[in-house]
Amino acid sequence: MDTIAITYQKHNKSYPYYGYLRALAKKQHTLLICDDEPDLLELYAAMLSDEYKIIKTASGEECIQRYNEMKDKLENITVILLDFRIGKVTGDKIARDIKEINGAKIILISAYEIDHDLINKLKDEKVIMEFVPKPISLDTLKRIIAKTIWNDGYQ
């Protein structure tokens, strides 16, 4: 097996192989996106499909089902982007159900005002990693997803 050694200078922030490493890492991670608004679901998928494998679901039940299917195939879903209001079910309920299965890195998103105590409780219980209010810019969303992917533990 060949070994590639990559060096960089931390102090002057010179990362000559950054583009190469980014290309190697492209599409290594799978995002499960769950939103019951078809336009938003398609928009998120289109915005993120260049960098990630995307699985789209439009209901809480489908989200849990697809998560289980991928787990059973031993395929890893890296992050779940989960809308808070999905039909009659809330995202915190879905997130708790997924946590009981095997846990996952979940980013909860919502266009609605959500009680800060609930969000803090979900984070403290390690049910979600982040909460993001809608609307959200593409750059901010990508930054939060990247932070979530590379975070090995819950903060």
Indicate where each model-derived feature is located.
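Non-catalytic signal-transmission and effector/linker regions of two-component phosphorelay proteins
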Residues: M1-T30, P38, S137-Q155
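Acidic, metal-coordinating helix/loop segments flanking the phosphotransfer/catalytic sites
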Residues: P38, K56-V79
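Two-component/phosphorelay signaling modules centered on CheY-like receiver
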Residues: P38-K56, E125-K126
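Acidic catalytic/metal-coordinating carboxylates
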Residues: S59, V89-K93
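Short amphipathic alpha-helix used as the core "switch/output" element in two-component signaling
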Residues: Q65, D92-A104
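Active-site residues of response regulator receiver
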Residues: L82-D83
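Hydrophobic/aromatic residues positioned on beta-strands within the core alpha/beta folds
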Residues: I109-A111
